[in-house]
């Protein structure tokens, strides 16, 4: 009540109240705590009303190639020296042509450089072949995930008709708009998405230095934007291949070091091929799991109709039209031994779900334990049409409330299954998890998950973009992970999850939308949360500044922020590179 009376008084007596109050609220802990405890919108188990419009976070912005000094508030640890690199869509139209889907926007690279308590920001559009071709014609020339490029209006009717019959996988027509993630192979950094192409970048200048095509090295039609790494730098990924015997999923291994300075992914190998359960409808997947000894691939009922995809251009449809949620199919787990490339014989199934990001996986007592962010509805890709994300009022509320929410779940996959194990036996020996693996009459194993959360996470809208202290705890038993809460269509909070006690710590500031959290360990730490969390926090409010946030990873309290007076769109993934 005090704050409301005070607010009324200020507004009644000062024309500068709108500019003054946000600054004061950010700086004074008492007001910040009050605002944090004041409900800004009604939310009951994912049903939200009165969501603010976030369209400004999903519109074209200008790049900022010259470094901009940020205004630092609070404390940036002196040891925090390096660059937070992020990538995401930043341009959503060329001329009169507009993209349809969030995933389609042209890649914009962001760099927050931190040195001795100071922060400098800059951004550049990736000079991909797609970006340059679209810019030269001032229209969309190359199709993207949710947008079909229209025929050249300068061509005659016959030429435009015949252009419909160009296969979507033809190299000249395949996008190299790598806007999803930074990945590392042999010490170099690449921008990637899920096509054949990656773009090698100079992480200091943000300039593209080389375009790399997976299919020039191995027989794959693309790879994920979420590889995994062994301690020696060996990288593993998953790719696709379509041949005379149908569709298959490929486990890929990239060696850790270069033989020659000029090489890229030379020496890459396919170590295992997994046949698709349904030849004409393989699964769409975004990531996979890895332990010290095993790769875990999840074949989920989010299906790619190969016929629809192959004929998409003829039918005047985008690639995304060929992806559908088919809940009549169960989810299947495949386990591959990394050393030999052998696909293990166990057949593990669970009820239908969709996962985009795995949290972590590890081995214990002859089992693989894998933790995932899961959704029970596979229509998320449809939700992220730009027309949905840019809605306001009741229309926005309806889109959000109809969207599937993502929650952390644990599955157990027993590796050494006896042929004599009785039907109905739970084959998991693990006392610390309620996840079960029950043998069926046909020899398959039915896996039921354990929820790694309580009701409070439902009130936060679920969680996505999970991150851990990867270098030390990937593939090992762990205690914490970090992610974004989704009481909106984009992340509106940062969350620390204790997977052992199933408790949460939450950071939120009303009207601001944080990016995927990145954990940076303090020098010499062995603790899972001994460091800081970095996140880029943006707002649609033109009277406020976007900023990079630093949280103490242990107590999840703010240490500092560095404000940048530049418009930024909501992005996907990133990484921290120390110097």
Swiss-Prot record:
Signal peptide extent: none
UniProt: Fe cation binding residues: 226, 286, 357, 573
Intracellular or extracellular location(s): Mitochondrion
Tissue: Highly expressed in retinal pigment epithelium. Also expressed in stomach, small intestine, liver, testis, kidney, adrenal gland, pancreas, heart, skeletal muscle and prostate (at protein level).
One Gene Ontology term, aspect cellular component: mitochondrion
One MF term in the entry's GO annotations: carotenoid dioxygenase activity
GO biological process, one term: carotene metabolic process
Family per record: Belongs to the carotenoid oxygenase family.
Cofactor or coenzyme needed: Fe(2+)
Assigned EC number: 1.13.11.-, 1.13.11.71
Chief location: mitochondrion
PANTHER family: BETA-CAROTENE DIOXYGENASE, CAROTENOID-CLEAVING DIOXYGENASE, MITOCHONDRIAL
Reactions catalysed, as given in the entry: all-trans-beta-carotene + O2 = beta-ionone + all-trans-10'-apo-beta-carotenal; 5-cis-lycopene + O2 = 5-cis-10'-apo-lycopenal + (3E,5E)-6,10-dimethylundeca-3,5,9-trien-2-one; 13-cis-lycopene + O2 = 13-cis-10'-apo-lycopenal + (3E,5E)-6,10-dimethylundeca-3,5,9-trien-2-one; lutein + O2 = (3R,6R)-hydroxy-alpha-ionone + (3R)-3-hydroxy-10'-apo-beta-carotenal
Cofactor note: Binds 1 Fe(2+) ion per subunit.
Keywords, alphabetical: Dioxygenase, Iron, Lipid metabolism, Metal-binding, Mitochondrion, Oxidoreductase
Name of the protein described by the UniProt record: Carotenoid-cleaving dioxygenase, mitochondrial
Domain of life: Eukaryota
Biological classification of the source: Eukaryota, Metazoa, Chordata, Craniata, Vertebrata
Role this protein plays: Broad specificity mitochondrial dioxygenase that mediates the asymmetric oxidative cleavage of carotenoids. Cleaves carotenes (pure hydrocarbon carotenoids) such as all-trans-beta-carotene and lycopene as well as xanthophylls (oxygenated carotenoids) such as zeaxanthin, lutein and beta-cryptoxanthin at both the 9,10 and the 9',10' carbon-carbon double bond. Through its function in carotenoids metabolism regulates oxidative stress and the production of important signaling molecules.
InterPro entries from the UniProt entry: Carotenoid_Oase
């Amino acid at each position: 009540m005090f704050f409301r009376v005070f607010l009324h008084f200020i507004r009644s007596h000062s024309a500068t109240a709108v500019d003054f109050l946000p600054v004061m609220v950010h700086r004074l802990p008492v007001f910040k705590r009050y605002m944090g405890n004041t409900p800004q919108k009604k939310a009951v188990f994912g049903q939200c009303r009165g969501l603010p419009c976030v369209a400004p976070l999903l519109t074209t912005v200008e790049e900022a190639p010259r470094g901009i000094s940020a205004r630092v508030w609070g404390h940036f640890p002196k040891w925090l020296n390096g660059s937070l690199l992020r990538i995401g869509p930043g341009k959503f139209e060329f001329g009169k042509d507009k993209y349809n889907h969030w995933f389609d926007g042209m890649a914009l690279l962001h760099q927050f450089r931190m040195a001795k308590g100071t922060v400098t920001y800059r951004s550049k559009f990736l000079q991909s072949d797609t970006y340059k071709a679209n810019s030269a014609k001032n229209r969309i020339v190359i199709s993207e995930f949710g947008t079909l490029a229209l025929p050249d209006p300068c061509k005659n009717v016959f030429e435009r008709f015949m252009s419909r019959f160009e296969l979507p996988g033809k190299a000249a027509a395949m996008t190299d708009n790598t806007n999803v993630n930074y990945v590392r192979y042999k010490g170099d950094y690449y921008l990637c998405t899920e096509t054949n192409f990656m773009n090698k970048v100079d992480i200091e200048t943000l300039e593209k230095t080389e375009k790399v095509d997976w299919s020039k090295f191995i027989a794959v039609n693309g790879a994920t934007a979420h590889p995994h790494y062994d301690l020696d730098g060996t990288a593993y990924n998953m790719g696709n291949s379509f041949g005379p015997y149908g569709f298959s999923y490929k486990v890929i291994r990239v060696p850790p070091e270069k033989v020659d300075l000029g090489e890229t992914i030379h020496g890459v190998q396919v170590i295992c091929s997994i046949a698709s359960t349904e030849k004409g409808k393989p699964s769409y997947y975004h990531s996979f799991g890895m332990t010290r000894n095993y790769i875990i691939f999840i074949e989920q009922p989010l299906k790619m109709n190969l016929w629809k995809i192959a004929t998409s251009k003829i039918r005047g449809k985008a690639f995304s039209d060929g992806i559908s949620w088919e809940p009549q199919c169960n989810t299947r787990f495949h386990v591959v031994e990394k050393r030999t490339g052998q696909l293990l014989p166990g057949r593990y199934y669970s009820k239908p779900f969709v996962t985009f990001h795995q949290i972590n996986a590890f081995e214990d007592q002859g089992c693989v334990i894998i933790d995932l962010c899961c959704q029970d509805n596979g229509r998320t890709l449809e939700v992220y049409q730009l027309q949905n994300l840019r809605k306001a009022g009741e229309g926005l509320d309806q889109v959000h409330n109809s969207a599937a929410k993502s929650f952390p779940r644990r599955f157990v996959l027993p590796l050494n299954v006896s042929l004599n194990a009785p039907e109905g036996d739970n084959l998991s020996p693990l006392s610390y998890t309620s996840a079960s693996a029950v043998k069926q009459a046909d020899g398959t194993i039915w896996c039921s998950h354990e929820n790694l959360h309580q009701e409070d996470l439902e009130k936060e809208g679920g969680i996505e973009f999970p991150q851990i202290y990867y270098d030390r705890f990937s593939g090992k038993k762990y205690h914490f992970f970090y992610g974004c809460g989704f009481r909106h269509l984009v992340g509106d909070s940062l969350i620390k999850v204790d997977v052992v006690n199933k408790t949460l710590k939450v950071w939120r500031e009303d009207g601001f939308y944080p990016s995927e959290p990145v954990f940076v360990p303090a020098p010499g730490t062995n603790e899972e949360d001994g460091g800081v969390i970095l996140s880029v926090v943006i707002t649609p409010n033109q009277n406020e500044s976007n900023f990079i946030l630093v949280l103490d990873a242990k107590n999840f309290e703010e240490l500092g922020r560095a404000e940048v007076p530049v418009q930024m769109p909501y992005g996907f993934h990133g990484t921290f590179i120390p110097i």
